[in-house]
């Protein structure tokens, strides 16, 4: 199979990259009607598979699960997830031929083998749905001409898909129809109904393309969402230890600090995050972030270039074929980092202290969010899509670090995201070595204190203006307006 994106003419590549339209609430007045009375069969029952299935069933749809024979006979976790929640579970041969819609919610690396196994069993005129377009775009999967191919991609981990639905809300979602596979012209109606069934229509739905979703999703998860948080955790912790700060305190400041800091980001963007700092600290964080952006911009450009031309996917798939040798080695190395092995201390850290003593962390989040957004939009990805794949998801990933450090983050995200995270981390750590030599405890570990409390008014005005005028803040203000019912993470 050939990389689908690379087979397209340039104009078509650009058109699909730029495909992103925010859908109005009145476009979802039909709810799940387009899927009512149809049999939905989900392949796989991990985090996304289980939680999407629960939501779809609670929305009145007919949902069952199909798993590999071995998963059923050995009563693996996927089988227990489905059966203990009262779903019908069967083999591919038992359930796929009866399905009107097959939802492929297995891990990326299994998509080709899964689709090749189920496609001969799918009935004429049925629909194949994905929640990530990697198999179509990067692997170039060719689906039977009579089958409709759609995507519904919630922009958060599966657990949040369920929790927000139970609150009567939902999570922002991207939907798309594969232009090569919409023989009956009902792909969009079915994708909208699927999004409504998961609750996504209550938080905002972007009508996108498989290509735009994949290229932006890969970029966000490799850089700000996972790579920058892992790199920042290691660098900030090691610096505090070098400067004599208690290891337990340093561990707790990092582990829980990302979550607290990005909670402010979630509600009011980069502007609100920096507004949580004192004026002197805000100036310092802004200056540090601008320096970080200058240093890291070439790395962000390289990641985006490698994603666009398929270099990243080709490299990762070579590792798949080598039994994930690099992925597993890098995962083991991460487990041995000093930060990962140092438990959080039994010390109380007030909410504001995370900001006051984590100025560098704030600067890293700002730099990472803005760079990811700027790099994506420069590559032709529309601002709304770039926002969801940078700023919006950062608090959700930070929340996983708060639970069980980098182990939990890398366990929760996909193997695809984890592989890209390690690539970024390995390149960024040495890139920031000289920068970190200049860092002291005033910006990570202890705070500025009272010895530096003077701020030039003109400088502060310029910084505040620059923060509020950044394009990620402008599009973010609009999109957050659709998410006013968001729950607090902390």
Swiss-Prot record:
Cofactor(s) needed: Mg(2+)
Residues at the catalytic site: 132
GO MF annotation list: ketol-acid reductoisomerase activity; magnesium ion binding
PROSITE patterns, sorted: KARI_C, KARI_N
Swiss-Prot/TrEMBL GO biological process terms: isoleucine biosynthetic process; L-valine biosynthetic process
Pfam family, any one: KARI_N
Residue ranges of every copy of the KARI C-terminal knotted domain listed in the record: 209-353, 355-486
One of the record's GO cellular component terms: cytosol
Known function: Involved in the biosynthesis of branched-chain amino acids (BCAA). Catalyzes an alkyl-migration followed by a ketol-acid reduction of (S)-2-acetolactate (S2AL) to yield (R)-2,3-dihydroxy-isovalerate. In the isomerase reaction, S2AL is rearranged via a Mg-dependent methyl migration to produce 3-hydroxy-3-methyl-2-ketobutyrate (HMKB). In the reductase reaction, this 2-ketoacid undergoes a metal-dependent reduction by NADPH to yield (R)-2,3-dihydroxy-isovalerate.
Protein name in the entry: Ketol-acid reductoisomerase (NADP(+))
Gene, per the UniProt record: ilvC
């Amino acid at each position: 199979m050939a990389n689908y994106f690379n087979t397209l003419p340039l104009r078509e590549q650009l058109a699909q990259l730029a495909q992103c339209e925010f859908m109005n609430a009145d476009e979802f007045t039909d709810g799940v009607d387009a899927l009512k009375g149809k049999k939905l069969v989900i392949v796989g029952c991990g985090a996304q598979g289980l939680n999407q299935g629960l939501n779809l069933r609670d929305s009145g749809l007919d949902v069952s699960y199909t798993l590999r024979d071995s998963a059923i006979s050995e009563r693996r976790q996927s089988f227990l997830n489905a059966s203990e929640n009262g779903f019908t579970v069967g083999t591919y041969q038992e359930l796929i031929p009866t399905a009107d819609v097959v939802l492929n919610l297995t891990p990326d690396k299994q998509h080709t083998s899964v689709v090749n196994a189920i496609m001969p069993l799918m009935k004429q005129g049925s629909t194949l749905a994905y929640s990530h377009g990697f198999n179509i775009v990067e692997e170039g999967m060719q689906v039977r001409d009579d089958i409709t191919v759609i995507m519904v991609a919630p922009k958060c981990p599966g657990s949040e898909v369920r929790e927000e639905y139970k609150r009567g809300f939902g999570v922002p979602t991207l939907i798309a129809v594969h232009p090569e596979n919409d023989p009956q012209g009902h792909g969009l109606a079915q994708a909208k109904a699927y999004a409504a069934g998961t609750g996504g229509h209550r938080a905002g739905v972007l009508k996108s393309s498989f290509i735009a979703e994949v290229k932006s999703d890969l970029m966000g998860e490799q850089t700000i969402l996972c790579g920058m948080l892992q790199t920042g955790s290691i660098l900030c912790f090691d610096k505090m230890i070098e400067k004599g700060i208690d290891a337990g305190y340093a561990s707790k400041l990092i582990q829980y600090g990302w979550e607290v800091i990005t909670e402010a980001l979630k509600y009011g963007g980069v502007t609100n995050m920096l507004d949580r700092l004192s004026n002197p600290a805000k100036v310092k964080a802004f200056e540090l972030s601008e320096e970080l952006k200058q240093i890291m911009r070439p790395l962000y450009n390289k990641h985006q270039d490698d994603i666009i031309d398929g270099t990243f996917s080709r490299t990762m798939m070579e590792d798949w074929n080598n039994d994930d040798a690099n992925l597993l080695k890098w995962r083991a190395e991460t487990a041995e980092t000093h930060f990962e092995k140092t438990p959080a201390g039994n010390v109380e850290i007030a909410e504001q202290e995370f900001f006051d003593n984590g100025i560098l962390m704030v600067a890293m989040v700002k730099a990472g969010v803005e760079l990811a957004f700027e790099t994506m939009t420069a590559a032709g990805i529309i601002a709304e899509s770039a926002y969801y794949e940078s700023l919006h998801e950062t608090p959700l990933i930070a929340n996983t670090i708060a639970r069980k450090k980098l182990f939990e983050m890398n366990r929760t995200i996909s193997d695809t995201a984890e592989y890209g995270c390690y690539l970024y981390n390995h390149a960024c750590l040495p890139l920031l070595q000289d920068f970190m030599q200049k860092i002291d405890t005033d910006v990570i570990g202890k705070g500025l204190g009272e010895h530096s409390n003077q701020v030039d008014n003109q400088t502060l005005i310029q910084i505040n203006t620059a923060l509020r005028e950044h394009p990620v803040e402008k599009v973010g203000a609009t999109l957050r307006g659709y998410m006013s019912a968001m729950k607090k993470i902390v």
